[in-house]
Amino acid sequence: MIEAYFHELWWLLGALFFGVFLGSLTGLIPGFHVNNVALILLALSPGLLELGIPLSAVAAIIVSTGTVHTFLNYIPSALIGAPDGDTALSLLPGHRMLLAGNAARGVAWSARGSQLGLFLSLPLIIVARIAFGPELNWYDGLRDWLPVILLVISLLLLATETTRLDWPKWVQKITGKRLGNDSRLAGFFAATIFFLLAGLYGWAVFELPVDSPVGMPSPSLLLPSLAGLFGIANLLDIYATTSHLPPQKENWDLPPVKPLIAPCFWSAVAGASMGVLPGMTASQATVLVMGGRNVAAKVQGKEGYGMDWETRRLTELSDDELLEIAVAEAEEGYEGPQTKQDLEVIAILSAVNTAVTVMVLGFLYIIGRSRSGATLALKMMYPIETWNSSQPTADFVRLLAVTLAAGIMAMPIMKIVGKGMLRLHAAIPLQSMVMGVIIFVTGLVWLSTGFVGIGVLIVGTILGLMPPRIGIRRSHGMGIILVPIMIYTFAQMADSFGFI
């Protein structure tokens, strides 16, 4: 009995450390997502079982990989400029921290946010079990309203687009200038058009047949589409606008917990809601949390954080002038409202990102539904025993313990990797590094999806270059997932993504 216990414990510890290693790789390599690792392990699971490796250990590898990934994926987003869909919103704040010489501080705030998101989401699992378990069973009622809920949330996300744009001259002429310059309605309209355009792109892409030229298992066009929309497009912008960086301050101290408790708790709540709703991501949850904070601030008579893309102000300054301003602020040690907002956005996004990972694992065992590629792999690997009694299942407790351990281990890893990345910045010219990442991501896309994926990557990149030039948030590109799901659910068709 004791021998069997220690045998299982050793497999679990080995899986934990190997998963932490894989999560570090997926977090740092742009375009290489934990879902790819999960699907590869799923394909290899019969062979691993024959070698004597238990499926519980394979599951622990997947879970620990996903947890560490959510901690470390801020680093390529901010220090290289190659985010995945979940960290799209952190690019601009993280990039501003980098330009101001405060990249280390951004990494520290991200680590604290992920840590709080991990711990604050744990009590929410119990709340979710009560609400969505067999006693109340809210999920059946929620499922009937799912497309309406997704539509309402999408409209709320679009409504938070506060950018003011000019209507085209012909529109102004037709309407007698009732629709004129500096119009918020024009910004909302532009965001809506881009959201729908990304959705149609996603609907077309996910219907395409695709095979890997080298036989990689479960090829998915989600990789090239998201890599184009949020990764390569950002990298090209950075390559064209930034040639050198200021010296970076070695400020790796974690921020105090108390000021971040409230925003990170609501981030965990938003992450929990995103965990049960298919197609919603950490980026959308972050926008909702920041929007909610703005509403609360206005109710209290305070000034909220703006989420505008100040296109007119930016076009008045050249890239060199913007860099000089950032360096000057770094040298003076002045922390303005923009810096405070950037740091809070980084912490909130990291908290949401990690909370979503914890909650999708919880919902897998509460309602038996997968909400990510990793949990889908777990569900396909072996039967999931749902949490129907007062006590959680042993399998769920084991994987939750692995999640906590992986999150604790990820904290010092972030500091070590962040320091190494900044040394790379000092040793390798930024533009050379960016071009190297673009070539690497393109090669990875070809290996996994062939020339079809390359075509999808090119189209996605073109779409991804549009938002900053129009003046809207790039996160509206998540219509690539939301719009197809809403189309399928409203039409009462089978969901080809496996979320419902």
Language-model region placement:
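Transmembrane alpha-helix interface/packing and boundary motifs in multi-pass membrane proteins
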Residues: F18-N35, V68-G81, L157-T160, A268-P278, ...
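Helix-coil boundary and interhelical linker segments in multi-pass alpha-helical membrane proteins
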Residues: M1-W10, P46-A60, N388-A394, A494-I500
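Helix-loop-helix hairpins and the membrane-proximal interhelical loops
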Residues: M1-P54, L208-V295, V299-E303, I439-T442, ...
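Intrinsically disordered, low-complexity non-transmembrane regions of multi-pass membrane transporters
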Residues: M1-Y5, A103-G106, W167-D182, L235-A262, ...
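Helix-loop-helix junctions within the multi-pass membrane cores of secondary transporters/permeases
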Residues: I62-L151, Q284-I439
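Hydrophobic alpha-helical transmembrane segments of integral membrane proteins
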Residues: E8, L12, L16, V20, ...
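Membrane-embedded alpha-helical modules
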Residues: S110-Y239, E385-G498
